[in-house]
């Protein structure tokens, strides 16, 4: 939900200033996320679109914590069972990990004080345990998150497509371009542009800074082989003045 929030108190409210007498900070427009305890996922509405349960405010920005990071988190916290988060709904937002709807903060300052021996032992433990990670609950939880937020996804997709279409009568297809970095954001942008305009003839420009990961370059190759993006023209603009390799 897009609503006003106090940037200091991190609480959503419908006033131009914070309702707390001790604060009175000017509120700002923000995307507010809630937590549905029944579905155990974050949602964009105060009432869960899937189950109808009342939800509670959780953060203004959030990201999923993948199974590999969950294992590392458990090792850092010295949990008795390093796989304890395999069957939990774990996210990160507001400077804290959100585990089944409850926030847990990790002090990076304290971790930076750890000895190299301790960090090395955690790395060794992670390497030996990584193959035992169970991804099944994570996949189910993400699928539930997508289902619960389908209306929101559809809304922002349609909004983005309407925005792209406002330029259809202003520019020729040959004058348009997509800045393509090989990441998730530019992939979504490419999909929205091609779908909205009904063509894959919009030029994509890939900026090769020489700092790209090998996986990024590999994805660029695979991108052109996907059924949806097959035939998309990708022009590579390489940095030839400074080589960071």
Can you say where each PLM-predicted feature lies in the sequence?
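ATP-dependent adenylation/nucleotidyltransferase module used to activate substrates
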Residues: 2-38, 42-46, 52-55, 67-74, ...
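Short, Gly/Pro- and small/polar-rich lid/capping loops
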Residues: 58
């Amino acid at each position: 939900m897009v609503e006003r929030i106090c940037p200091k108190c991190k609480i959503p409210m419908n006033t131009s200033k914070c309702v707390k007498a001790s604060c009175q900070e000017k509120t700002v427009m923000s995307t507010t996320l809630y937590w549905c305890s029944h579905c155990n996922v974050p949602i964009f509405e105060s009432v869960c679109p899937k189950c109808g349960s009342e939800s509670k405010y959780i953060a203004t920005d959030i990201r999923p914590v993948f199974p590999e990071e969950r294992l590392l988190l458990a090792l850092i916290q010295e949990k008795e069972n390093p796989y304890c988060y395999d069957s939990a709904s774990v996210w990160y937002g507001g400077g804290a990990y959100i585990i089944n709807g409850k926030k847990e903060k990790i002090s990076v300052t304290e971790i930076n004080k750890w000895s190299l021996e301790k960090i090395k032992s955690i790395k060794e433990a992670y390497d030996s345990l990584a193959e035992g990670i169970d991804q099944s609950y994570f996949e189910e939880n993400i699928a539930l998150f997508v289902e619960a937020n389908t209306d929101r996804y559809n809304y922002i997709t349609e909004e983005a497509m309407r925005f792209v279409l406002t330029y259809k009568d202003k520019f020729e297809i040959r004058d348009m371009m997509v800045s393509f970095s090989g990441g998730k954001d530019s992939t979504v942008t490419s999909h929205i542009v091609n779908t909205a305009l009904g063509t894959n003839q919009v030029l994509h420009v890939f900026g090769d800074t020489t700092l790209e990961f090998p996986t990024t370059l590999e994805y660029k190759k695979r991108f052109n082989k996907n059924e949806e993006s097959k035939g998309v023209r990708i022009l590579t603009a390489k940095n030839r003045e400074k080589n960071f390799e």
